[in-house]
Design a protein with these regions (language model features):
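Sec-dependent bacterial lipoprotein signal peptides
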Residues: 2-29
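OB-fold and OB-like single-stranded nucleic-acid-recognition modules
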Residues: 31-162
Length: 162
């Protein structure tokens, strides 16, 4: 036999928990930001194969001159423009990275605007350093990047998704 006080206590406890869960859900929704997609009109009509960073590095020879879509962490600094694997369990050295060759022949604009990726906008430049990005471009094995320190280059970058 249940006591009447027990049922009332559970009802009082459920209301605050429900409100707390609702508040947590609303907070998580507000933290979600929209992806920014910068596109170029280069390579329209090309088919891009989506591939994981590890799969590309394991079979790089198979992707020479192939159009791919790949995700990783972009790193830039003086003399550095590289895409590295964003996995915690991978080697992020230059020998396991791609040189990223952005070309003026393929200007990248924020979808639906004429705002360029590398243009000064809203008081600053778009920050992509140390961010996870998705890139589309063509893999070129003969180009090993600055001082030939990289496995290959992704050229003709026609999409950057932040």
């Amino acid at each position: 036999m249940a006591l009447p006080h027990q049922k009332q206590s559970l009802q009082r406890l459920n209301k605050p928990l429900g409100l707390l869960a609702l508040l947590a859900l609303m907070t998580l929704q507000s933290c979600k930001h929209e992806n920014k997609i910068y596109k170029s009109e280069c390579d329209i009509g090309k088919d891009f194969k989506t591939i994981s960073f590890k799969q590309l590095m394991d079979s790089l020879d198979d992707y020479d001159k192939q159009y791919i879509e790949i995700s990783g962490k972009y790193e830039e600094d003086k003399g550095i423009s590289a895409l590295v694997c964003d996995s915690l369990f991978s080697n992020a050295s230059n020998s396991n990275a791609l040189w990223v060759d952005f070309s003026q022949d393929c200007p990248l604009y924020l979808s639906g605007t004429r705002q360029g990726l590398f243009e000064y906008n809203d008081g600053g430049f778009t920050q992509i350093n140390d961010k996870k990005v998705t890139l589309r471009g063509v893999i070129v094995l003969r180009n090993k990047g600055k001082k030939d320190r990289y496995k290959a280059t992704i050229e003709r970058v026609s999409l950057v998704k932040l």
